[in-house]
Design a protein with these regions (language model features):
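Conserved GNAT-fold acetyl-CoA-binding loop/helix
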Residues: 27, 31-54
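Conserved GNAT acetyl-CoA-binding A-motif
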Residues: 119-144
Length: 205
């Protein structure tokens, strides 16, 4: 059952494709994750120019979706290559970041549902999430991200132990995956996000 607060958010929130000019505002969402958490293993906040380049590079092939309400960007999600080799083409890695104070309201689910639908339109068959994972929850990292992905249907598939060092402690990393379709011989070619019919994309926003 959808709570009143979540219902109100879903009624007022709008999704759209990110634009390079969103870089500065999106970076304000991302920066606290770098500076205050181990959710991302980056040490330094990227520059606006670097973040803009990341958006532009992603949009060459993959979706980069932002959630907006009243002109304010509340979060974003995107996919990218799982690996660069051609045989991995039907798998994509997911990322999602929600603005501080906006978690627990259904925003993450809304963004991921759009990403999943678009990925199906692209003929992507696997969504893979690389998730920072603590042995024990601490002030920098909890197991919430893994639990969020599990609620969306992602399955745990593997773990790397003590592979990342941040804030003076070691963290694990887990992989979770969501299968989007049957893995047939001679699968349909993957369609770049920029080549999808924009009208079809807008319908799911």
């Amino acid at each position: 059952m959808i709570g009143k607060e979540e219902k109100n958010m879903n009624e007022t929130i709008k999704l759209r494709t990110a634009r390079p000019d969103d870089a500065e505002e999106l970076l304000k969402i991302y920066a606290p994750y770098v500076e205050n958490t181990a959710i991302t293993f980056e040490y330094e906040v990227p520059s606006v120019a670097e973040f803009r380049a990341r958006i532009e590079n992603t949009l060459k092939k993959y979706p980069y979706i932002v959630a907006e309400r009243g002109g304010e960007l509340l979060g974003y999600a995107y996919t990218g290559p799982f690996k660069s080799r051609a045989a991995y083409n039907w798998a994509a890695e997911t990322s999602i970041y929600v603005k501080e104070g906006q978690k627990g309201l259904g925003l993450g689910r809304k963004l991921y549902e759009a990403i999943e639908t678009i990925s199906r339109m692209q003929n992507i068959l696997n969504l893979n999430a690389c998730i920072a994972y603590p042995k024990v929850d601490d002030e920098y990292l909890t197991k919430n991200s893994a639990q969020f992905h599990e609620h969306l249907g992602f399955k745990y598939v593997g773990e790397f132990h003590d592979c990342a060092y941040k804030f003076g402690r070691w963290y694990d990393m887990i992989w979770m995956e969501l299968s989007l379709g049957e893995h047939m011989a001679d699968p349909a070619a993957v369609v770049a996000f920029c080549d999808l019919d924009k009208r079809d994309v807008e319908k799911i926003m």
